[in-house]
Regions:
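Structured catalytic-domain cores with a bias toward divalent-metal coordination
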Residues: 1-148
Length: 148
């Protein structure tokens, strides 16, 4: 049986520090999220986090592409190289593949704690339903952003 692994990402935007704090709390309490599933915790954009910037060269969320064949100028962008590294590590064919990635964010929008979903994959709906049932969180389906 394959190991089920979930990637939990905080600090995708370096100026969003609450998710990083939450991940540190999860790590402190060894059994807080253990249900027979292996978790990988990472800071998505560590350099931007260290500097307190949203990003260095480009939005990390917009830096994931199907192909690594970018033009030479954009290849020098930190976030594009970081996105390639993350896919090489945690993508479906990566060295530590994860079946699901949960990207934690903060916002100034008045929407409270919630789940925002992109796309309509069945497994994602199942996970969102599980979280909604367990924590009573509202779920927002975001489909207008073609970049997602």
């Amino acid at each position: 049986m394959t190991v089920q692994r979930i990637l939990i990402v905080s600090g995708t935007h370096g100026n969003e520090i609450n998710p990083i704090w939450a991940v540190k709390q999860f790590n402190r309490e060894e059994n807080s999220l253990k249900y027979g599933i292996e978790y990988e915790y990472i800071i998505g954009n560590p350099i931007a986090y260290e500097k307190g910037y949203r990003y260095i060269d480009a939005d990390l969320n917009r830096s994931f592409k199907e192909s690594k064949n970018y033009d030479q100028q954009k290849n020098s962008f930190y976030e594009i190289n970081r996105a390639n590294f993350l896919v090489d590590q945690f993508g479906i064919n990566g060295s530590k593949p994860c079946q699901i990635a949960i990207d934690l964010h903060t916002t100034t929008a008045n929407m409270g704690t919630s789940i925002v979903m992109y796309g309509r994959r069945f497994k994602d709906f199942c996970l969102a339903a599980l979280l909604q049932n367990k924590f009573g969180l509202p779920i927002y389906l975001h489909e207008k952003d073609k970049a997602q």
